[in-house]
Amino acid sequence: MKRKKQDRQRHLKETIDANPFITDEALADRFGVSIQTIRLDRMELSIPELRERIKDVAQKQLDEVKALPMEEVFGEIVDLQLDERAISILDVKKEHVFSRTGIARGHYLFAQANSLAVAIIDDDLALTAKATIRFTRQVKAGERVVAKAEVQKVERDRTLVVVNSFVEQELVFSGDFLMYRSAQEQ
């Protein structure tokens, strides 16, 4: 459905504000226009390209991962509030998928969610004690997975972290991670 330029640009800004990780291709599909039109609209509205938007979100990251080295985190953490919430993104590439079907291997989605659950813990030691996971939709090469983690409950040496992963706005993975941590000081 084509819209008038001003209306389209207003909706474009709202869409990007709601999901800064959305690609120009996805926006073009959503608004029924060419990728070039989306890029021109972004330029007119002074909205940076995807890479710059990701960097902007990452610069707002307030806390530093304690429980594991950054190079061991699977996916790129773009927001982190220790013991509260975290967000990471994973661009699914051909090395992440089965060659015959083009569907992402489940352990990559689990690795992204699990490493985010470890990273969110405000402790030098964090281990997964138990995980209950659900895959709700297949993920294919070329899709971007945005994982959002939230701490639900903190006890002496256990923390419950809930992770939901999305492609666009569609849930593709969810998990409840019971994390072991060294006992918190009282």
Swiss-Prot record:
Q: Which gene encodes it?
A: fapR
Q: Does the keyword Transcription apply?
A: yes
Q: Which GO terms fall under biological process for this protein?
A: fatty acid biosynthetic process; negative regulation of DNA-templated transcription; negative regulation of fatty acid biosynthetic process
UniProt xrefs under InterPro entries? HotDog_dom_sf (IPR029069), Thioestr_dom (IPR006683), Transcription_factor_FapR (IPR017275), WH-like_DNA-bd_sf (IPR036388)
Q: Does the keyword Lipid metabolism apply?
A: yes
Q: Which family does it belong to?
A: Belongs to the FapR family.
- Relate the protein's function as given in its record: Transcriptional factor involved in regulation of membrane lipid biosynthesis by repressing genes involved in fatty acid and phospholipid metabolism.
| Stated name of the protein | Transcription factor FapR
This entry's Gene Ontology molecular function terms read: DNA binding; DNA-binding transcription factor activity
- Source organism per entry reads Halalkalibacterium halodurans (strain ATCC BAA-125 / DSM 18197 / FERM 7344 / JCM 9153 / C-125)
Q: Which UniProt keywords apply?
A: DNA-binding, Fatty acid biosynthesis, Fatty acid metabolism, Lipid biosynthesis, Lipid metabolism, Repressor, Transcription, Transcription regulation
Q: Kindly give the Pfam families that the UniProt entry links to this protein.
A: 4HBT
